[in-house]
Amino acid sequence: MILVYSTFPNEEKALEIGRKLLEKRLIACFNAFEIRSGYWWKGEIVQDKEWAAIFKTTEEKEKELYEELRKLHPYETPAIFTLKVENVLTEYMNWLRESVL
């Protein structure tokens, strides 16, 4: 299983993009939640509220998901990165694979 993490400016955008990725069957599901972020941007420290999302997919869909997320993302320089999960309940992995077919 592959987890793709990204942040968004607000709940609406996180849910909108999550829905589009579901409709394209690039992900089986996603989780979105409010976060507080601190980061450097254009020479200044910024602290802000954002929304994060974790998108769940298969290794076969990872590249296509990454490219589509980059295309849809509203940020100039979005945080988008993947994590490979080694141990997944077999039944869950079967459901995930079936969901992105």
UniProtKB/Swiss-Prot annotation:
Reading the lineage from the top rank, the first entry is Bacteria
Protein encoded by which gene: cutA
A UniProt-annotated Pfam family: CutA1
Q: Which GO terms describe its biological process?
A: response to metal ion
Q: Specify whether Phosphoprotein is a keyword of the entry.
A: no
- Localization per record: Cytoplasm
Q: Which family does it belong to?
A: Belongs to the CutA family.
Protein name (database record): Divalent-cation tolerance protein CutA
Q: Which NCBIfam families match?
A: dival_cat_tol_CutA (NF041095)
